[in-house]
Design a protein with these regions (language model features):
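A conserved SF2-helicase RecA2
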Residues: 244-317
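Conserved nucleotide-binding/hydrolysis micro-motifs of P-loop NTPases
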Residues: 11-17, 29-32, 92-95, 138, ...
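Conserved Helicase C-terminal RecA-like lobe
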Residues: 76-99, 112-229, 299-300, 306-317
């Protein structure tokens, strides 16, 4: 019975357009029609078919109700942020291992199965391929192949340390962080570490230590440390593997690019060339374009159908 309603959100479209319908169901019930009607008129034509006219109609309908303020608009004193996608080429052995996994995955899906079973199996194979892009030992423990990403990471780290810089390093895979941790210890690089198993008190202690200058590098699992941390001692951010949801990556980068940061921030995204990771980055761009056309640079995310996920595995460049 309220006379006025307001909804605040950082990501109006985090996974799909139906989330926008949910917001408007609270703000202005029936304005966008029933859920079935919204899907028929907007979500399916826009997301599946790229229907420009449907996109423009939806934009015209929602724009009068949206007030959007970005961090750059409200924090004009914040230093610049530069984003670099670094595409690295796997060595011959590493790519042969990846390609064998990819071909085996495609052959597996010829068996069919229910739609949900098929989607779960495809997702599992995609995760295996994504781990292989990082380090072959994440798929086959004990297999020691040169890792293009590991070499790129060490090159970046050496360069930024020589200039007196510090870095936050994010990965979705805790096993990948463990490999990087071993690298840092061999190289004698002081670091901090945080993942989902880190107790709250220890988490606070490690953040405070890094902010006080203890460590040139902070290894962080993306889901455990992507929000709620102030790590402005770092002016570099390295994403070791692309996450499905670009908004999650951006929130992680903002651990350094936030109030209190006095230096420009550089964000690296390390992507393995000619792999599923490049497909994910391409989908990020497509989804961002979709959201920008509706919400002016909204933080859109990726939720893929079974067919879209299978296309990621089948495609090569």
């Amino acid at each position: 019975n309220a006379g006025f309603r307001i909804a605040t959100t950082g990501t109006p479209i985090e996974n799909r357009l139906s989330e926008l319908w949910s917001l408007f169901r609270f703000l202005n019930p029936h304005y966008l029609g029933s859920f079935e009607s919204f899907n028929r008129r907007f979500a399916i034509p826009i997301e599946r078919d790229g229907d420009r006219e449907a996109r423009l109609r939806l934009r015209r309908m929602i724009q009068p109700f949206i007030l959007r303020r970005t961090k750059e608009q409200v924090l004009e004193e914040l230093p610049a942020k530069t984003e670099i996608t670094l595409r690295v080429e796997m060595g011959e052995e590493e790519f042969a291992f990846y390609e064998a996994l990819r071909r085996a995955a495609v052959d597996t899906f010829a068996d069919g199965g229910t739609a949900e079973d098929r989607r779960l199996r495809i997702f599992a194979e995609l995760m295996k391929l994504r781990r292989a892009c990082c380090n072959a030992s994440l798929v086959e423990p004990g297999l020691r192949l040169p890792s293009a990403k590991q070499e790129a990471f060490l090159d970046i780290l050496a360069e930024l340390r020589s200039g007196g810089h510090k870095a936050l390093v994010f990965s979705q895979f805790v096993g990948h962080l463990a490999i990087l941790r071993d690298c840092l210890e061999r190289e004698g690089v002081p670091y901090q570490y945080l993942d989902g198993a880190t107790p709250p008190d220890e988490r606070r202690r490690r953040v405070a230590a890094f902010q006080a200058g203890e460590g040139d590098c902070f290894l962080i699992s993306l889901k455990a440390g992507g929000t709620g941390l102030n790590l402005t001692a770092a002016d570099y951010v390295v994403h070791m593997d692309p996450w499905w949801n670009p908004a999650v990556e951006e929130q992680a980068s903002d651990r350094a690019h936030r109030i209190g940061q006095e230096r420009p921030v550089t964000v690296y995204r390390i992507v393995a060339k000619n792999t599923v990771e490049e497909r994910i980055v391409d989908l990020h761009a497509w989804k961002r374009d979709l959201a920008e056309s509706l919400l002016e640079e909204s933080d859109a995310a990726v939720r893929l159908s079974a067919e879209e996920m299978l296309a990621l595995i089948r495609e090569t460049r």
